[in-house]
Amino acid sequence: MPTTRVLLPALFLFLCIASRAAQPTAPPVIALWEHGAPGFETRRNEPEQHQDWWYKNIHNPSLTVFLPAEGKANGTAVIVAAGGGHRELVFNPEGVEPAQYLASLGITAFALKYRLFREPGSKYTLDNTAEDIRRAMRTVRARAAEWHIDPRRIGVMGWSAGGEVAALVAYSPGGGDSKAQDPVERASARPDFQILIYPGPLGIPARVPRDAPPLFLLGAADDEYVAPVLFDLSRKYHEAGASIETHIYAQGKHGFNMGQRSKYVSIQRWPHRLTEWLEDRELTRAH
């Protein structure tokens, strides 16, 4: 009996240590501004609200970093902006899950938490959201060497309202300020390519420039809100002679995420179409 009493606590301690060691390490989170967003520094420590798949009350914009497995990084990076109507952030299904998928392809992925200007009681505006995505692009480009990223292969992926966020940087010059004291602000905020999944209409320009970032565009024809955006943006890219690949599925509605919860086989398999596009553009190949 005495021996048993000695062994049981030791066994319990061993199991606790083993369990802790087996738990995956949480991905690192990087605040976009060290002291908080400009003009709202005093709010940076306010706790976020979240439950299941959504986040709200975001006052300290950040990037959650998803690194490829050791030895698999190919030099490409993507910043992922989830949707949620600018009222909430569908962070897990449209931020974390696609970032993990991209990391499995050797792409260094960053899930963005940006400020929500339509959240009830919000003091933010669309300009603040634009500040967040521009700062995110500049942060990744300025620190590209740290993550073994090619600064000429940094893209943006936007879902629904996150597609509107992506448009805020895709169709503007975004050049850095060479005289800025902050080295991050010297980097360009313009993405080298973009991936838009059922994007909203906000931020889509009246005319797409010929040098617009190459675009992978995807959604469903029975998505009443988004279908007109898909056709309109495809037409504008075609008229400009800019590079675009469009996938419009007959059925799927809105918010099918990575497809695994859809009853439609074509929607379930849509990430394969994205992978093929990335491969065709040699964005999954190490340079």
Put a short name on every predicted segment.
Residues 82-87, 221-222:
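Active-site glycine-rich loops that stabilize anionic/oxyanionic intermediates
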Residues 90-91, 97, 115-147, 260-267:
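Catalytic nucleophile-loop/oxyanion-hole region of alpha/beta-hydrolase
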Residues 224-231:
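Conserved alpha/beta-hydrolase "acid-adjacent" motif
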Residues 23-72:
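N-terminal cap/lid segment of alpha/beta-hydrolase-fold proteins
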Residues 91-110, 234-235:
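Short amphipathic alpha-helix adjacent to the substrate-entry channel of hydrolases
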